[in-house]
UniProtKB/Swiss-Prot annotation:
Name of one Pfam family that matches: Ribosomal_S16
GO molecular-function terms, A-Z: structural constituent of ribosome
Organism expressing this protein natively: Rhodopseudomonas palustris (strain HaA2)
Record family assignment: Belongs to the bacterial ribosomal protein bS16 family.
Region (Disordered): 87-110
Record protein name field: Small ribosomal subunit protein bS16
Key words, A-Z: Ribonucleoprotein, Ribosomal protein
NCBIfam families named among the record's database cross-references: S16
GO CC terms: cytoplasm; small ribosomal subunit
InterPro entries registered for this protein in UniProt: Ribosomal_bS16, Ribosomal_bS16_dom_sf
Any single GO BP term: translation
Domain of life: Bacteria
Length: 110
């Protein structure tokens, strides 16, 4: 059983509200979950403290048990200081494909 900390969408049409939940990765996004850890309201201002609320003790407990945070939840945990998020860096993506091939061939010849 792979356990994930992720967002479950709630709210109405065009007015999203998300619960931060712990769920089995096989469960539907908005369906069954194991435990609710907090909420996220994207409609509030970014500097508003009530925009994101997490029970940090429960989050740390689930991370210690091996739960994997989703990308968005990992950003939240980085902001709150619970878990450092690894930076995604792919410098080759910005280089045009032809130049990438030429650089790879030049490196292979050396």
């Amino acid at each position: 059983m792979s356990v994930v900390i992720r967002l479950a969408r709630a709210g109405t049409k065009k007015r999203p509200f998300y619960h931060v939940v712990v769920a089995d990765s096989r469960f539907p996004r908005d369906g069954r979950f194991i435990e609710r850890l907090g909420y996220f309201n994207p409609l509030m201002a970014k500097d508003n403290e009530a925009r994101l609320k997490l029970d940090l003790d429960k989050v740390k407990d689930w991370l210690a048990k091996g739960a994997q945070p989703s990308d968005r939840v990992a950003r939240f945990l980085d902001i709150t200081g619970v878990k450092k998020r690894e930076a995604r860096n792919n410098p080759e993506k910005a280089v045009p494909r032809k130049e990438r091939k030429a650089a790879a061939e030049a490196a292979a010849k050396k």
